[in-house]
Amino acid sequence: MIIGIGVDIIEIERVRQAIQNNKNFLSKLFTEREIDYFISRNMNSEVIAGNFAAKEAVSKALGTGIRGFSFKDIEILRNELGKPEVILHNGANLIGNKLVENNNSLRVHLSISHNNSSAIAYSVLEGEYYGNM
């Protein structure tokens, strides 16, 4: 059963400027594994903006926005084929588990795309709905 959807779009230039103007931008919002991935992609602003939009989309699908947890609690990684995968930690994981009957049944689907100016992410949460939020 679908229990949440979220979408976010961001201007890539805003992310590029944030990286240039704030030396702590990446470390405040992204985990070490995410930053390692960015480095492997030559710190590509489109990739970083896509991950940022993905975190926002997942937070909206959880129904809370970024309340009760930090951006680092939503980790966006890639599998061996490059497909984005979501790992929820700490507060985000607690909120996600409150939505489903069985803590292991929450599945987070994610799609990320970008063009020259914007990055967009769409997230769908799936599981056995518990509805105790």
UniProtKB/Swiss-Prot annotation:
Entry's Gene Ontology molecular function annotations: holo-[acyl-carrier-protein] synthase activity; magnesium ion binding
Record key words, sorted: Cytoplasm, Fatty acid biosynthesis, Fatty acid metabolism, Lipid biosynthesis, Lipid metabolism, Magnesium, Metal-binding, Transferase
Record keyword Transferase present: yes
Gene Ontology CC terms: cytoplasm
Catalytic activity: apo-[ACP] + CoA = holo-[ACP] + adenosine 3',5'-bisphosphate + H(+)
Keyword Transferase (UniProt): yes
Enzyme class per UniProt: transferase
InterPro entries: 4-PPantetheinyl_Trfase_dom (IPR008278), 4-PPantetheinyl_Trfase_dom_sf (IPR037143), ACPS (IPR002582), Ppantetheine-prot_Trfase_dom (IPR004568)
A Pfam family that the UniProt record links to this protein: ACPS
First-listed, main subcellular location of the protein, grouped into a coarse class: cytoplasm
Subcellular location: Cytoplasm
Any one biological process term the GO annotation gives: fatty acid biosynthetic process
Signal peptide residue numbers: none
UniProt cofactor(s): Mg(2+)
Binding site for Mg(2+): 8, 56
Family annotation (NCBIfam families): acpS, pantethn_trn
Family: Belongs to the P-Pant transferase superfamily. AcpS family.
Function comment: Transfers the 4'-phosphopantetheine moiety from coenzyme A to a Ser of acyl-carrier-protein.
Protein name: Holo-[acyl-carrier-protein] synthase
Gene name tied to this protein: acpS
